[in-house]
Amino acid sequence: MELKTEELKYKTADNDEISAFLAIPEDNNAKHPGIVLIHEIFGLDDHIRDVAKRLSTQGYVVLAPDLFTSNKLSQTITKDGIMKTMNFIMSIPPEKQRDEAYRAEQMAKMSPEDQKAISGVYQTLFMNRPTELLTQYLSSAVDFLNQHPSVNGKIGSIGFCFGGGMSISLGCTGKVDAVVIFYGENPEPVEKAKNVKNAVLGIYAANDTRITSNVHELVKVLAEAKKPITIKVYPNAYHAFFNDTRPQIYNEKAAKDAWRMVINFFKDNLQ
């Protein structure tokens, strides 16, 4: 399927602006479901743009916001800081990704400038994450899609890592018809998940116990609220196993199967 892609900005409820990547199927002006695609902690990058295009070829209008580009957040979360943080995280072996002592030891070897840049990103996104504000930005992304002439009114969300947690946070607003979580944290408090509008697909890695060990809490809340939920935990897979730009962590077998599940899930719930 031929696609039309565009880099754009959309307005938020507080009159800020968010940069975003838009992918639209080109097929005689037909209307399609929309999907909000939420990036990893690194911000919008070429990997996420590629995922947007892959989804769009399946018949979806996909909007991938770059959440850290708002005037409020771009002051502390700079592109340079994100890049240095990304390079730092990618230098850590998969089995050490959640080892805070190891991370601190490795960071101590860096220059004061790099430590400051990385610490700024960590402080904002890991220690004091503005989840409510970020969810508002995503809610505005849903509004953008609902107003787009190529969208038929059905909206889903999907996110990876940081974006997986934000995907379920957006789902808790009741504004999307289907939610996909790739190894994302539960909403806080997890009871908010009872407000999810419809179905949830959660995809996790067995070797990501900090995240995966809490999934049962989300399942319990959704089951009590009688919301459909499907959970898949891939053995021998690490956090971020879907990202094929990270060869240390990428798990081709798990990624391909997870993609099959995503396509079928959106087909069942959006089309």
Regions found by a protein language model. Name each.
Residues 1-271:
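N-terminal cap/leader regions of alpha/beta-hydrolase-fold enzymes
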